[in-house]
Amino acid sequence: DDQTGLASGGNKTRKLEYLLAQALAEGADTLLTVGAPQSNHCRQTAAAAAKTGLRCVLVLGGNAPRLEGGNLLLDRLLGAEILWAGEQDRLALLAEAAQAQAAAGHRPHIIPYGGSSPVGAAGYAVACQELLAQAAAAGWRVDHMAVASSSGGTQAGLAVGAWAAGFAGQIHGISIDRRADDYQPALAELATQTAGLLGAPHTFRPEEMIVHDAYLGGGYGVLGEAER
């Protein structure tokens, strides 16, 4: 998925394929989303907006840096408007920004954090079946899948796709910012909602969501001794 071609690729493209279809079907002209200053999700959302002729507003945590580089620079080059949350709650500011866009005559559509809604997660339910089909065609035996996991859409989507395909193996989520006992209920709920959206109702239980939280370290994006 790093070769998808949307502003250097990344896993969010599969989610955005469905999220953008939803936004366009609703007649939106402006996308808004939220993330960290160097968010890959925000960079890909800005690229998807530019590709489809939509405006883009990004709500980023913290304060503007003295110099902009990396994904933040790409966000600017892709035409995104950037709002810095500072000490404010990012999600509250996101809602306020959407209201301001509507008041200005635009038709805003909020893309959730990480693209992780049932619509976004559907992209990875499909991806799981694609992966399993490719593995079977290549003669590979797959009984474990491991992914980085944060907002939950990738892992929840894979869980739905695996269940629908009758995959007997396990989906492992390596948490980047949440303890397992706090995260598993949210994952199970998202997977359950995604299965319902896809017309294959199934209730996922928190204990079915395998989350490894031993690698959290000092937090998201914090380089510690273990990483050195």
Kindly label every feature range from the protein language model.
Residues D1-R228:
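PLP-dependent amino-acid enzyme catalytic core
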